[in-house]
């Protein structure tokens, strides 16, 4: 009986690994947009944290350099948070049915 349970668990783990690989490939195609300054600075990145585009409203280019740098950093951080949330949500389906320890966080 124990041998069958182990075989089932191994099969489940292999399926989860396959699902996670497919999901990671899909995450590279999903884009999220981070914003700051009420949309004056926007950063588009993939859920694999590859920055695709940076948009800065022309009105900010004549302004304070420090403020612009802060807005870019804030937009980047917003995009990273959105990418992480999307990744966690999508990967939750890949691990469905597998017993995971409480608070376990996947490395992606």
Curated annotation (Swiss-Prot):
Lineage: superkingdom: Bacteria
Compartments reported by the entry: Cytoplasm, Nucleoid
InterPro entries on file: YbaB-like_sf, YbaB/EbfC
Keyword annotations: Cytoplasm, DNA-binding
PANTHER family to which the protein is assigned, alphabetical: NUCLEOID-ASSOCIATED PROTEIN YBAB (PTHR33449:SF1)
Subunit comment: Homodimer.
NCBIfam families, per the entry: DNA_YbaB_EbfC (TIGR00103)
Protein name: Nucleoid-associated protein HEAR1046
């Amino acid at each position: 009986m124990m041998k069958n349970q182990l075989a089932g668990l191994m099969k489940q783990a292999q399926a989860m690994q396959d699902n996670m690989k497919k999901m990671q490939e899909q995450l590279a195609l999903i884009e999220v947009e981070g914003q700051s300054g009420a949309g004056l600075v926007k950063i588009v990145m993939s859920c694999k944290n590859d920055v695709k585009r940076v948009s800065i409203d022309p009105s900010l280019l004549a302004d304070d350099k420090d403020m612009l740098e802060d807005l870019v950093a804030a937009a980047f951080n917003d995009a990273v948070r959105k990418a992480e949330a999307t990744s966690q949500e999508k990967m939750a389906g890949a691990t469905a049915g597998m017993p995971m320890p409480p608070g376990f966080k996947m490395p992606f």
